[in-house]
Amino acid sequence: MRYLILISGFMFCGMSLFAQARKDTTNSVKIIQTYKPTLIEARKIETLPVIEKPKPAAPNYTYNIEPKKVKTDKTVSNIPAADLYKTEEFNYPSSFVKVGYGNMKTPLAEFYLNNKRDNKYSYGLQYRFLQTNSELNKTFADFTTHHVKGYLASYSTTGEFGLEASYKQNKFNYYGYKDTSKIAEKNLGRTISNFEAKAYFNSVSDKSNKIKHRTAFNFYNYQIGKAIENDYAISSKIYGNVSDFNDLENGILSATIGFDYTTFQHLNQKSLNRIFLTFDPRFDFKYDVLNVSAGLNTTVYFNGSDTAQPFINPFIKVTYPLIENIATVYGGVDGRYKKQSLKSIIQTNQFTSNYNLTNIYENIKLFAGITAKVGSSADAVFEINYSDVTNMPLFISTQDSFNSFTIINDQANILKFTAAFNYSFSEIARIGFTGNFYNYNFKTQPQPWQLPTIEAKVNMNFNIKNKVYPHFDLMAMSLQKQRTGLSETNYSTNTINAFYDISAGIDFRFRPKLSLFVQANNIMATRYQRWYNYPVLGFNAIGGLTFIF
């Protein structure tokens, strides 16, 4: 019992550390993007939805369902352009080549080369090309994308070592420009390039009392126009088992240590250099039927000139088996200081022209939920969480000739409810549903600009005699409020209508190594808007062949 008293004291100290007043997190760089008078081939990244599909559980699984944490620094995930290519429901045993063509003069080419199964090495190379040419002269919504990726990994009795590298280039346009602005029309083109590299080592050991670690070094160079961001990060999770004592069992003591150095440069402006140090200790154990994880989320921030700014938040998660092997309830406390970056801004809304690099502080997040499993066919999760966020980013339209976006930050309280359900009819059919419901309360802003209050996704997959694989996706989003204008006393507002998007396709494997695919997006041909003044492409479809070798 005395150990429980010590642990309680430890958590009380963590709560008192959290009680420190949040510090000034503002580090704003506002930039009005300039462009050379050239019109390049374009890529519209987000205007059709890529649906984050619920993953129906495979039949006869035996794992326990782990609840998925809900991020609130960006309440709505970015919706990139529709995957005109559709990932097959079966796994390729080795390498493949995929080619296709669509109704918007859409060529698709993809290949994936890898070695056969090997217990010592794995390596591979992948390339993807996708382009549209819809001749929508009034929208300039077409895009071009190239993506190449390579990897190498080796396995031994001491651990796994791996290298990865990728390069992705997206060309797209501003196309929400004002029709009367001929200057804007000549400066629509934007190009995003992103190079990423990773080296990692995961140690392994058959001895339960030996300390292990998972260490990774990550680098990326991200560029859009004249704005360039470089990021160097290394993190290591060190962990080991702790001998049982008294009523505490299955103890694991761990700590994740991270170093992140980010540079940002635009035109002739002075470079912005930032350092983020993280230290997250954890103690995981089982007490009676409770599984407990307790510790701290610690971030120390340096921006090159100010003194170090520490941010410390407690972390607690407790799970309880309500009905053994059927239902589990969980709850806890979380929170963290988070980096805002050029990469995350553009990946969320690539029509942004003012880059506000104000960091985000999730002061506290309270969460509770229940997971359930019914036999080997169905599983579900329900979660409610409340977050208090400093400097939550909101996208608003500027009044420039492109109708581009900028970011304003505000204090936010967010209540979110998530429900997800998956059901499998043996291997013949699988269906998944996820829904998110939000309630926002901002300190200064009257509306959650460009954020929905409801979003839902449905995914269905079928397997007909291991030859025909139809699939169906539906994505829906509630209406949103939109603001145009930087002045807090003089701006206009609009309503973006609620919308839904239906996608469907079929994969037909008429030979063991040769299959036909057809994918159709936005079947209802609704020119809805995810971002104000940027209507999505209409109905689009692509079909082709996949050859496995």
Where is each model-derived feature located?
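N-terminal periplasmic/intermembrane-space "pro-region" immediately following the signal or transit peptide
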Residues: 18-87
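Outer-membrane beta-barrel transmembrane domain signature of Gram-negative proteins
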Residues: 189-200, 216-288
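Outer-membrane beta-barrel translocator/receptor signature
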Residues: 77-81, 88-97, 101-148, 159
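Short loop/turn motifs that connect adjacent beta-strands in outer-membrane beta-barrel proteins
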Residues: 85-92, 117-120, 155-160, 204-211, ...
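Membrane-embedded beta-strands of outer-membrane beta-barrel proteins
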Residues: 111, 148-150, 197-201, 232-240, ...
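Surface-exposed extracellular loop regions of Gram-negative outer-membrane beta-barrel proteins
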Residues: 114-134, 249-262, 272-303, 426-437
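Flexible loop and strand-edge segments within Gram-negative outer membrane beta-barrel domains
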Residues: 132-149, 164-212, 216-231
